[in-house]
């Protein structure tokens, strides 16, 4: 189910987009990954624990999720940032869509983000603490006073 969402970085820069997956706040260190394939492996890689992953490849979700390619039993990342999110996967190995996997694993995703611009910010200024959240559940003001402040987003 799609919903309005926002990405807010610790430096105050924000991006509005379309949310997918589980509707909750996802707070973590925003990083980027330049891989063209393997989003399932990246999401479940324990080395991404506590991080929000920005995929620089623009189209994510097209091969769905299978039960063989996980690096661990659960999604390690706190969130996912993409340019284009594929609603309907097409792959003979696919057992479920990426969105269904995100909901099952209670992970939020935001799409329709200018990931090239975001990646330049991260490259030039270094990783930033950020939060992805459904705009109907939080405002920026509430976000600064919530648990996200404990993660470094407070003013």
Can you annotate each of these PLM segments?
Residues 4, 8-9, 13-140:
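Feature captures the catalytic cores and cofactor-binding loops of soluble hydro-lyases/lyases
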Residues 144-149:
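Conserved small/polar residues in nucleotide/adenosyl-binding loops
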